[in-house]
Amino acid sequence: MNDNTIHETGPTAASEETAPCWRCGLAASLEANVCPHCSARLRSIAADPDQLVAGAHRHASGAVKAMLWAYGVLLPVGIIHALVMQFSVDAEVPFNEATRTRVYTQILIVEGIDSLIILGVLLFAPRPAPAPIPTPRTRIAAWTLLLPVLGGLLALNVGYHWVLRQLLRVPLITDELTAQIDILAIVALCVQPAVIEELFCRFYALDCLQEITSRHAAVWISAVMFGFMHVAMLPSIPYLIVIGAVFAYMRLASGTLLVPVIMHFVHNLVVSLMG
């Protein structure tokens, strides 16, 4: 990464110096603002050849700071939500219609707060560099694998939560929430998470993290962030981290956020109907 060697690129080699892009490692001009190979934003280093291309560029730093600020608010909101849920739902008392209405009201309030925070960041914060565009073959493979991968995740969900219910006897609030499926449940459990959570975790956060770390690290860090956004579903966090990573890889492979949005919505809908 510290190699600022002049690379021969043809007739213009004498006038054009290149250095490895911080993201993909391929040669990029020292004068370029965007990597021609992976679209990473680059920091001009013509004034100081000892610096690396696109090291800690101000725009990237602004996007990362906005992402961290947003998550720093989303996480406490989730923790407060979990604590209120813990004290407002008595496991010894039957989950009646009044309790269901109260819990769903709380969920919708929290989701409204989360939506305002995330949409505010998307509208007003700096944008991270876009993820590298996958090849047509990779995109086709991602769409082709959408249903098989989703089926595998649903099987993993059933197995994981069977262990929690039957072997570990862990009470799951989602069992009560999905006992009756109506428009309220579909909006709260399927629509809002599939749109808002994907916009933050698989779009903004994932691209921000790719500004400062490798692709695989960005995938798993964003997946952990996604998992802990669901503190109210504490026993499910390990599974949510796995599904978050799968959604992230599918977004990168397909080149579009639509794939994880579809997968997230269908996954939650099927799980809710099974409940």
List PLM regions with ranges.
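Hydrophobic alpha-helical transmembrane segments
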Residues: 67-68, 108, 143-147, 183, ...
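Juxtamembrane helix-loop-helix connectors linking adjacent transmembrane helices
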Residues: 91-105, 127-193, 211
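Short cysteine-rich clusters marking metal-coordination/redox-active sites
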Residues: 21-24, 35-38
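Alpha-helical transmembrane segments in multi-pass membrane proteins
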Residues: 65-126
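Functionally important transmembrane alpha-helices
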Residues: 78-83, 219-223, 229, 235-275
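Short Cys/His-rich micro-motifs in 6-15 aa windows
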Residues: 39-50
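Structural signal for the C-terminal ends of transmembrane alpha-helices
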Residues: 120-130, 249-253
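Membrane-interface helix/loop boundary segments of multi-pass membrane proteins
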Residues: 197-221, 249-256
